């Protein structure tokens, strides 16, 4: 099947409805799936630390969204995981920068029992001071454990070096002082503001049944007429300040280099989804060991690079790239790669085709797995686009777009953590 036709087919298998209370329902049919994946996404994530109201703004401690996620696993004195397990369903939950998610897999004939249980827990929570105290201990331990993960530490340390005031610089669970500061009033205010039907999206992925056949009958569905997609943009970065550098161990024997870059709009382009996809393509070209670009540059400069990776954090309130290179020449890789692109512009189209194929193939491959397919469907929902919109953006990226990203690599504000060989081995 032609790739474009595959993306069109994903859209044809997607049905979007709304309940009369305003909750969005996204149904993605997946004929070969035995189980059904259900995810309730709440538009309240770790970045949401300010509640706005006519009476005034309320500042919340970091980690509030994640704390609520933990609390809502308890309903009427019972643990939701146990209740779902009794129905043959496995319930999980996770908090991201933008939202909170409650996800489970289930046999199709159990959804009419499990979905009402989850929605009742999300819409009718009763706060218990004893449970809050219990979860404070649990989450404090979770934060302490996260600090032992060097990769997580470097990720948040780099963003903190680049933008100390950004919520993105804080682990989603918050800091220990935030958890200690949380009180029942903060949690009640956040819950009352966030856990409303109009801030929720229910994803149903798997099987070929109509949407109504999987949902409890009391959820009356309707189409939303005359919907106009919201164009989400990312602003340009402030002028770069002096780069910051942290060295762990002996600077003469660098083994690992972690680089954070603050990124935003590029000349002529500020669309958030477009830039997310562009950076994904560029990362596949520059930071995959099996890419033609890396093979060429390694042979040309005899680079000793054993590991490369890139992770993008891009949202309306700012963007960051976290790059990791490992090997004797890890600290020089970004500069060498940027220079090589400018010297070999005639090859950009070839490299670009590799990056585009790599990304579209990944989406097609992921669509065979319900959990991965959900992630792409959630991205479409977050950016208010279709699968075909994503394909067109990928297809239309050109050499000048790629060069603009290379310019950003060279000119953006940077934070670098160098880890010496001894420190890296000790980890």
Swiss-Prot record:
Q: Which GO terms describe its molecular function?
A: metal ion binding; metallopeptidase activity
Q: Name one GO biological process term.
A: proteolysis
Keyword check for Zinc = yes
**Pfam families from the UniProt entry:** Peptidase_M16
Question: At which positions is Zn(2+) bound?
Answer: 66, 70, 142
* This enzyme's EC code(s): 3.4.24.-
Where in the sequence is the active site? Answer: 69
Note on how the cofactor is bound = Divalent metal cations. Binds Zn(2+).
Q: Name the domain of life.
A: Bacteria
Q: Main EC class of this protein?
A: hydrolase
Sorted keywords for this record are: Antibiotic biosynthesis, Bacteriocin biosynthesis, Hydrolase, Metal-binding, Metalloprotease, Protease, Zinc
Write down the InterPro entries for this protein, in alphabetical order: Metalloenz_LuxS/M16, MPP/UQCRC_Complex, Pept_M16_N
Q: Which cofactor does it need?
A: Zn(2+)
Its biological purpose is as follows: Required for production of the bacteriocin subtilosin. Could catalyze some step in the processing of presubtilosin.
Q: Which family does it belong to?
A: Belongs to the peptidase M16 family.
Q: What is this protein called?
A: Putative zinc protease AlbF
